Amino acid sequence: MSLSFCGNNISSYNINDGVLQNSCFVDALNLVPHVFLLFITFPILFIGWGSQSSKVQIHHNTWLHFPGHNLRWILTFALLFVHVCEIAEGIVSDSRRESRHLHLFMPAVMGFVATTTSIVYYHNIETSNFPKLLLALFLYWVMAFITKTIKLVKYCQSGLDISNLRFCITGMMVILNGLLMAVEINVIRVRRYVFFMNPQKVKPPEDLQDLGVRFLQPFVNLLSKATYWWMNTLIISAHKKPIDLKAIGKLPIAMRAVTNYVCLKDAYEEQKKKVADHPNRTPSIWLAMYRAFGRPILLSSTFRYLADLLGFAGPLCISGIVQRVNETQNGTNNTTGISETLSSKEFLENAYVLAVLLFLALILQRTFLQASYYVTIETGINLRGALLAMIYNKILRLSTSNLSMGEMTLGQINNLVAIETNQLMWFLFLCPNLWAMPVQIIMGVILLYNLLGSSALVGAAVIVLLAPIQYFIATKLAEAQKSTLDYSTERLKKTNEILKGIKLLKLYAWEHIFCKSVEETRMKELSSLKTFALYTSLSIFMNAAIPIAAVLATFVTHAYASGNNLKPAEAFASLSLFHILVTPLFLLSTVVRFAVKAIISVQKLNEFLLSDEIGDDSWRTGESSLPFESCKKHTGVQPKTINRKQPGRYHLDSYEQSTRRLRPAETEDIAIKVTNGYFSWGSGLATLSNIDIRIPTGQLTMIVGQVGCGKSSLLLAILGEMQTLEGKVHWSNVNESEPSFEATRSRNRYSVAYAAQKPWLLNATVEENITFGSPFNKQRYKAVTDACSLQPDIDLLPFGDQTEIGERGINLSGGQRQRICVARALYQNTNIVFLDDPFSALDIHLSDHLMQEGILKFLQDDKRTLVLVTHKLQYLTHADWIIAMKDGSVLREGTLKDIQTKDVELYEHWKTLMNRQDQELEKDMEADQTTLERKTLRRAMYSREAKAQMEDEDEEEEEEEDEDDNMSTVMRLRTKMPWKTCWRYLTSGGFFLLILMIFSKLLKHSVIVAIDYWLATWTSEYSINNTGKADQTYYVAGFSILCGAGIFLCLVTSLTVEWMGLTAAKNLHHNLLNKIILGPIRFFDTTPLGLILNRFSADTNIIDQHIPPTLESLTRSTLLCLSAIGMISYATPVFLVALLPLGVAFYFIQKYFRVASKDLQELDDSTQLPLLCHFSETAEGLTTIRAFRHETRFKQRMLELTDTNNIAYLFLSAANRWLEVRTDYLGACIVLTASIASISGSSNSGLVGLGLLYALTITNYLNWVVRNLADLEVQMGAVKKVNSFLTMESENYEGTMDPSQVPEHWPQEGEIKIHDLCVRYENNLKPVLKHVKAYIKPGQKVGICGRTGSGKSSLSLAFFRMVDIFDGKIVIDGIDISKLPLHTLRSRLSIILQDPILFSGSIRFNLDPECKCTDDRLWEALEIAQLKNMVKSLPGGLDAVVTEGGENFSVGQRQLFCLARAFVRKSSILIMDEATASIDMATENILQKVVMTAFADRTVVTIAHRVSSIMDAGLVLVFSEGILVECDTVPNLLAHKNGLFSTLVMTNK
């Protein structure tokens, strides 16, 4: 066939009637604009003039947008589509002619190239911000508009109309070119880049100038927005380097919490104004949210409608293609009367055209769907950020009475932050479904009715009737989940108790008892999990079975009720429609549940936002104060001297005025004055009454009184935390005549530092807790830490003052926490300091030091006003002004001299109390609490350092390995799936269930394929042979049997997967618990408690509830994809050729996504905890924050944490969209390839329909394969962590002797022989005891002493084989303990530890958890421990409740309970490991007395905390550095004046 532009007919070149009357010349004329544009733009694009001429340097590869940016892109895409149609029409029309006519499609091809070039050219101009180059585009659109208009006019003259496709295409071209021309004119009008004297200069957005902003979705062009192309760099880079917070940067300004907070707050305030005149109405949060975020939701809904409507293109195109193939197969194609031009109807009846349209429809549908998802997710994140800011702002204004009186608990606030805001965010995600789903369902039913008639309604009815069952199942799932959560909380509580008391449990051989208790709770939890698994299985079953049931009902009804045969086109289009219909009906139950939860969340949020607030704080700025003159007169005090050397011995009779300050008495001013004050905690009843007090400026005011008299309330009333019923709090104006000091010049007169009675710490470093936002001053910081005696404690911390403390950091004692809070108040450069009972948790040494160095020296020398609440009356001699409180009123106010003169009775009462305190002081001087605190901290640090050392060694090994690895190896490790861990998890569920799951899954999907294949054969048979009734019955029967089998297998597979997951969870937890409980004590010393507990909480929860559904979804989507590929390949083997490149593309997409997704999920998780903790710690320290006036700083911190969490979540969502767009486009390519291969190669219309149906299915499941794969990889991390603990070596519980060989009453005498004993904690550690030899007689009382770290406690552990005895032996009553089973050995000895441990339960359970003793024996033990009367007075007696840790008893009582516990065992050997270290002297005396009488005939080994406690011992062992250096009686040891024991005795005197 001859090739020429106008064809090889000479008449085609005839121009006798005019050039414009020749269609070939008109088509040639249309080439001119395209050639012009290519000629102009290609040199610019290749030379790169645009980018070199950039006037603005932008660090991102992004740009500003010219006016009409999005419209231009939309019009350009529309134009490209019309060009494709023009090319297709030209090729089809040309195929109908005898010779080739290039003019029919060549201009369209050039137009397609030119239009593509125009958008690339425009993109580069925007990148360079050089709009003058747009003039070329303007000329192009003008020329294209003119030439297309000429062509349209010619067609009109030729008699063509809209029924002709060519006419329609040309008309569309004219409209689109005209609109694009209008866009260019608008750019000229706005930017004035040409034809105007003053061009409009526009800079790129502010966000793009910020190097920290990496989230570029709002700034990229429309194509990049739709495909998330800008994410490529981040996702690819994740292979080389893990994604961190620096990589994702900051949020754009429009998405930051503060921006959205302002929008929501303004909308909410507007609602409050509307209801201000209606007391019974509350402002609507719903309307406020709609006003603030309604527009993006409407945009998302529009995208969703478009996507849903385009979704119906699939069934319609399948119907058309199968019908065309069927006509070709039957030879019924009508080819007569073909004209040279195509009509629109003929064009749309072409199978290839339908295939391309299906491809484009899928591309558009998925693009709109992902755009809808993204907009709702972004809006939901913005809403959450705004709500968090609103809640936080409200917390900072919350009335103190709301929290203190229980009207608003910390748990409720945490729920608002962690749960309610997320509920509203998720509701917003699902919101467009509420109005999109009904339209989708109605459209689907209408199309089904058009295809199958009334029989379609039967299938729709099946779906509608079964949908409520899904809602019922969802409700039951929620109930089961709540029940599971309750049991899980109980199990974790018990596990936590075990881990905290593991040392005691091992020493008493009670591990199995407590392990059994946890296992019982676990069985209840598993029972609840079984219910959860059952309903989950039913939900999965319904999802899979309902489409099958609907199809079965429809086709059987159609076969018998309709006289027409079922055609392939109808069958497979109907199947596709049923799949579309089922999705919204199932989703409906989820949306309804979230809607109900959202309504409840809004109610809770509204109640919180309308709760009481504290009053205005203008009092802090002096606005409410009286004139200075009216509160200026104040009775001064004479100076007094301070003895900084003496410890805290103060006597009122020797009181003298100090010489600290020299100020005129009559001119001493008042800092704070309260007049006629009545204050309440919100109940309406006055807690403080008739308060008239004055706080002198620059002096020390002490507030004293009995417990509960209102001292702390008075401080809080002054700070504005209480409700003022009557009276005023006045803060004096600034005295301008007052001398200015350098130290006070920068101070705010009304700034306050405050240390609360209950210490409150930030989750931050020690330094940050002390400086509290103030600039760091090294000299001042050192002075403060020295004054508060903090330096020795700081030195014990692993990272010094850079160690993180608080809830998420190192656990400190009460005294250490108290001193840090006082140091915070001292460090602040404020004029006024409030200290609320700062000595309560401190021993006498620290109290004296803090009083002398911190208060009297540091604060008073700095001329600061100090208000001190205290019970330590011995410090009253230092007070400049004293306020005595009683029953919420001021009893007396004045100097100590005033009170001594005017209220002798009160003064004498104070003297009596001081004498009593002095007596207690004598005892406390010996019981050095601080030493104990530091010892405890040192032990904790030792454990952590040991663990850190092990981790550092592991890291060093890994680093050495990494040095040897090249980049490809690192990338391989980052992308490798943890298949070994997966295998361990699957085998944990049992091989039988694993094989059953695999077999049932394969069988189920085989049956589903068989159902569809049977349908293809059935419909193809009818279309070819028009088979009669007998064959119809055969096909219906076969179809019914297969559908029934498919429904049954759906149930079996869902149950099998859930059951296997449940079994795996059960086995993994059981193995973990037993491994941990039987682990060596060294493991618990070197592994943080939180780390172990995390295995039982978060990791177990993932294994229990997250892995099974992920595994089910992954296997289902993978098998569906494989079935689809197999069926398409069977129907059209040519498809296999295209499968390789598509498979390679899919491999790389999932490979890159999994790595990036894992990093982003970890970032999302890691940034969420600090945010929740910040809310929690703010609510706990609200009074302190407000006193310091640091609300703004804390708000800023909250906004930073919110934005950090939001940016991580936003990037994770964008990564998911990136994946789904690519897998959806890949699925569309599969559909296009399968369609073309089916049309050109298949002769069976049924198989063509089947192949296309599966091709459409694959689009839905490709992204689920990758998403589930990524989720499973993250979740398998939990299994890996659990398995890492399962490899730990357990203690050797077996002995060479059988338990039956051990005498029943062993040890009976209590004789102990220690032969050359060498002990170490682990094989790779140095010995802690070296060659110890000793002999202890039966019934002897032995004392063991030595300095810290000498090996005393190690010897006590050696008796119980808690440490490694690698040489020597211990023989008790003739039996070597190394031969005994561990349980037997430990159950026959008794020990009392330093830390008294009680477990939650009853007193009976704590004394005798094995339930072996009678009540009489228990009462006897309590009587011996002098607890009988106290226990009898409790409700329940022996069955009285013991709270967790025994917190409802004092420390002394707890230690006495431990003594009773030891007596219950009736062991002949008792070991006391510093048992009196943490109790007062009185309790110690009781303990010593009881031991001497109750254990008079037993061997008692006492490890001494104080040497005085073993002075009555019959034998003393003295250790130094693990060596027994002295062993003799006390008199003999004291006779050696230079001996270690004598030295210890002298030191402790």
Swiss-Prot record:
Topology, Extracellular side: 1-30, 94-101, 154-167, 323-350, 445-455, 553-571, 1012-1034, 1149-1245
Region of interest: Disordered: 944-967
Pfam families assigned to the protein according to its UniProt record, in alphabetical order: ABC_membrane, ABC_tran
Transmembrane segments: 31-51, 73-93, 102-122, 133-153, 168-188, 302-322, 351-371, 424-444, 456-476, 532-552, 572-592, 991-1011, 1035-1055, 1128-1148, 1246-1266
GO biological process terms held by the UniProt record: action potential; ATP metabolic process; cardiac conduction; cardiac muscle cell contraction; cellular respiration; cellular response to ATP; cellular response to calcium ion; cellular response to chemical stress
Membrane topology, from the record: Multi-pass membrane protein
Residues engaged in binding ATP 2: 1346-1353
Substitution effect: residue 478 to V: In HTOCD; rat ABCC9 construct containing this mutation shows gain of function
PROSITE patterns tied to this protein: ABC_TM1F, ABC_TRANSPORTER_1, ABC_TRANSPORTER_2
Domain ABC transmembrane type-1 stretches: 297-597, 994-1274
Segments forming domain ABC transporter: 672-912, 1312-1546
Superkingdom of the organism of origin: Eukaryota
InterPro entries documented for this protein: AAA+_ATPase, ABC1_TM_dom, ABC1_TM_sf, ABC_transporter-like_ATP-bd, ABC_transporter-like_CS, ABC_transporter_C-like, ABCC8/9, ABCC9
UniProt-reported outcome of changing residue 1547 to I: In ATFB12; compromises adenine nucleotide-dependent induction of KATP current; mutant ABCC9 that is coexpressed with KCNJ11 pore generates an aberrant channel that retains ATP-induced inhibition of potassium current, but shows a blunted response to ADP
Residues given in the record as ATP 1 binding sites: 705-712
Note: May contribute to the regulation of sleep duration. An intronic variant of this gene may account for about 5% of the variation of sleep duration between individuals. Sleep duration is influenced both by environmental and genetic factors, with an estimated heritability of about 40%. Numerous genes are expected to contribute to the regulation of sleep duration.
The protein's name: ATP-binding cassette sub-family C member 9
Organism: Homo sapiens (Human)
